[in-house]
Amino acid sequence: MTIEQNELEIKNNPHQSITWGQPIPLSPILAPDCPYPVEALPSIVRKAVVDYQQYGQQPLPLIACSALANMSLSCQSLANVARDNYLISPVSLYFLIASGSGTRKTAADNVFSKAARHWETLIRKRREPEVLSALTQHQVWQMEKDSLFSQIKRATYTGEDSDYAKEMLDELIHQEPEIPLQPTLYFEDATQEALAIHLAQGWPSASLWSDEAGIILGSHSMQGNPTRFVALLNRLWDGKTFTAHRKTTQGFTIENRRLTLNLMMQPLILQQLTKQASGISRQSGFLARCLMAYPANSMGNRFYQEPPASLHSLTHYEQRVTACLNQSEQLSHQGCIQLPLLKMSMAAKQQWILFFNAVEAGLKPQGQWVDVVDFASKAAENTVRLAALFHLFEGRHGDI
């Protein structure tokens, strides 16, 4: 019975009780979950995810995203991947998880990011004396440069010969001491400006990480100019150069940088961001670049159990994260340059082509993917990125 029919019934029979139909739920109705393809993960990752899930009891997709995001962070500066001679891309991945409060995503992130955070702290402490020495040398260099500028300026007013000072300055400028970079792997709740400046001037491989992504995507910089922030994230995913121009300060260029994205937000916030005029447009291509998950809530069934004495599978996972990060220790201001190029073996390429064509066939009118053409168009590239990361994380050599 419609609302109009009910109103008419009440008017004609004011003393008769009305039976209303089933109310529409206010919460979103999700399609039945597809089993998460945990068996497709590399054995090291699969065992760590499954073993931890038995204790933590978070939804499996949520734990897997944490493990895969840290795998992307640890491997993204080690290689690029080629689909053919012209289609070459980074191996970095973006993850976006829609989930409510209390799902224990932070706990899973803390467990699977432990090795990378420990590596970051260890390298920073080890390099601290070298960095302090370089900073002192740079201060001396700056004073010498300022002194030569003063000599040239004074000579300009007095008419003295300044050729020698100019030659000395020209030589000195090319001798600027380089300050070793200190790794900063995780940016949490960072603004667009802070992220861009660090990537341009700091450690060239990092991640944007938050279990309350609404703070980032709903920040002042995002609300003020969401298109610019999304353009930056899209460029970094593509591995392209991004130039930032400033009115009052010197601009900078982000080149040869790598970024992993791992964001979780409330489903309602994601809905608002994608629907409001000032939010993230589907046409921007940002969401399509993300691997998205909306796992069913497991709250109410997570009864306490004692943690295992040790998780050997998690130890093996952490060892691989550390080993991969060790290979990136020599990164410099130049960024992720001259990276090895991973190619698919003939068998892998054939399987990838079958997948590519199957997805493409579903994009036609009335096709399977007609409502999500933006996501489907990036699926094949995300697939080969995953394959490349599995290859790197397992320490394999040769083609994928």
What are these regions (language model features)?
Residues 1-400:
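Phosphate-handling catalytic cores of nucleic-acid transaction enzymes
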